[in-house]
């Protein structure tokens, strides 16, 4: 038990160190950042498939109703990390970037009969980008040069994290429901600088900052119906409450004289600037004899009516206010499955899990009035049993994931990610007979 607590504390501190390196995407400059997958190790092998799954030896926090299925004598601790390589392509200009991230730390145990409890730490979104462009200003009127170049530099960092506590209860066989309550916190920092080669033209900087601290509520239910002696079907439903985050955002507009270094700063602030969307999920999972599980998930995030801060106008007419037209509703469809010949078989490969999944996610960002990137992704994964004299219930989950984000006239992203998750399944409260 002490080892588990120490591991959890160490992983928690490590997550804080890696949290801001979870993305290199320029698209993380919009909204709350690049939205995190939030799936655990076994889900990631199926590309995030989750709503209809309830496992006795895995933590599925994406539907809290599943906690009721956790083994009565087990304590499950699961932590995962990812390594990713991303290729960015804009008009034939290609750049590669790589980064690593601790993705999640979750745990679960049986509290009472038919009642499971889970808690954990995971990212909600990531902000991390740094890019620039340079152009000529043709025939720019200037005392020092007939032609001037200007450059725009964009950078950002931060993200949102959440720690949650949840419970799931099965009041009667086949039906369960549960809830997670989370504390959501983090900072969003974004910086834009417009500078000119002509020293007579001021450099303009726009620094946007926000600090968010609020709650998040998720609810879930599952119903399992036996079709035959070997086949059953599970319907999973989830709902996440959308609400204002009661957080302010600030913008500092800085004009700097390139010759004298003298700056003039104008400060703007918007109260209650950010909001979480209402989110609905529905999933169906077919289970054949606990060997083959195939499922489909659909998720809807209601972003369309959410407002977002916008700086507009020039000079004394500059305004910083909430505006619409930045988002669309986000739809995600996932299909995947898991095959294992049987956990009680003696053969090593018979006890392995083989997983696969594919997803399509519709654009939810509006960039310069046009639809942002849509996302295609696919994954393959395995669950490798850890067998030794002390414990044969733990699992090493490894998966490979490909993600493509693209939109007409915008940057194309191709990301290859390796996910590694280690699920410790510790046997608690067992009575041992001494001869």
Language model segments and positions:
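Bacterial Sec-dependent N-terminal signal peptides
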Residues: 1-24, 435
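Residue-level detector of alpha-helical transmembrane segments in integral membrane proteins
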Residues: 9, 57, 270-271
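Single-residue recognition of alpha-helix boundary sites
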Residues: 13-14, 74, 89, 184, ...
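N-terminal, post-signal peptide beta-strand-biased segments of exported outer-membrane/organellar beta-barrel
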Residues: 17-125
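Outer-membrane beta-barrel porins/channels
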Residues: 20-44, 110-435
């Amino acid at each position: 038990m002490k080892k588990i607590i120490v591991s959890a504390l160490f992983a928690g501190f490590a997550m804080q160190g890696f949290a801001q390196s979870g993305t290199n995407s320029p698209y993380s400059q919009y909204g709350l950042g690049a939205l995190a997958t939030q799936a655990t190790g076994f889900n990631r092998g199926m590309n995030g498939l989750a709503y209809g799954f309830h496992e006795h030896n895995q933590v599925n926090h994406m539907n809290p109703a599943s906690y009721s299925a956790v083994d009565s004598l087990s304590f499950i601790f699961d932590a995962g990390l990812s390594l990713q390589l991303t290729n960015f392509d804009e008009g034939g200009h290609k750049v590669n970037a790589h980064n690593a991230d601790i993705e999640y730390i979750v745990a679960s145990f049986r509290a009472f009969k038919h009642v499971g409890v889970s808690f954990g730490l995971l990212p909600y979104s990531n902000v991390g980008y740094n890019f620039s462009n340079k152009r000529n200003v043709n025939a720019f009127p200037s005392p020092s040069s007939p032609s001037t170049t200007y450059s725009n530099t964009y950078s950002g960092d931060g993200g949102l994290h959440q720690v949650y506590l949840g419970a799931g209860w099965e009041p009667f066989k086949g039906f369960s429901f549960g809830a997670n309550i989370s504390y959501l916190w983090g900072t969003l920092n974004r910086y834009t600088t417009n500078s000119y080669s002509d020293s007579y033209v001021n450099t303009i900087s726009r620094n946007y900052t926000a600090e968010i601290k609020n709650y998040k509520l998720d609810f879930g239910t599952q119903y399992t119906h036996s079709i035959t002696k070997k086949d059953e079907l599970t319907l999973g439903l989830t709902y996440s409450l959308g609400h204002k985050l009661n957080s302010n955002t600030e913008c500092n507009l800085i004009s700097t004289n390139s010759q004298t270094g003298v700056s003039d700063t104008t400060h703007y602030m918007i109260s209650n600037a950010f909001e979480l969307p209402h989110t609905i999920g529905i999933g169906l999972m077919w289970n054949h004899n606990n060997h083959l599980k195939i499922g489909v998930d659909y998720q809807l995030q209601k972003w369309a009516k959410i407002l977002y801060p916008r700086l507009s106008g020039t000079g004394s007419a500059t305004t910083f206010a909430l505006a619409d037209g930045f988002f669309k509703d986000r739809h995600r469809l996932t299909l995947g499955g898991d095959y294992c010949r049987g956990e009680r078989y003696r053969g090593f490969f018979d006890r392995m899990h083989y997983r696969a999944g594919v997803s399509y996610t519709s654009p939810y960002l509006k960039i310069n009035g046009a639809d942002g990137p849509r996302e295609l992704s696919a994954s393959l994964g395995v669950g490798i049993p850890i067998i030794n004299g002390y414990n044969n219930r733990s699992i090493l989950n490894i998966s490979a994931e490909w993600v493509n984000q693209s939109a007409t006239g915008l940057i194309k992203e191709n990301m290859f990610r390796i996910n590694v998750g280690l699920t410790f399944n510790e046997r608690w409260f067992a009575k041992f007979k001494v001869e």
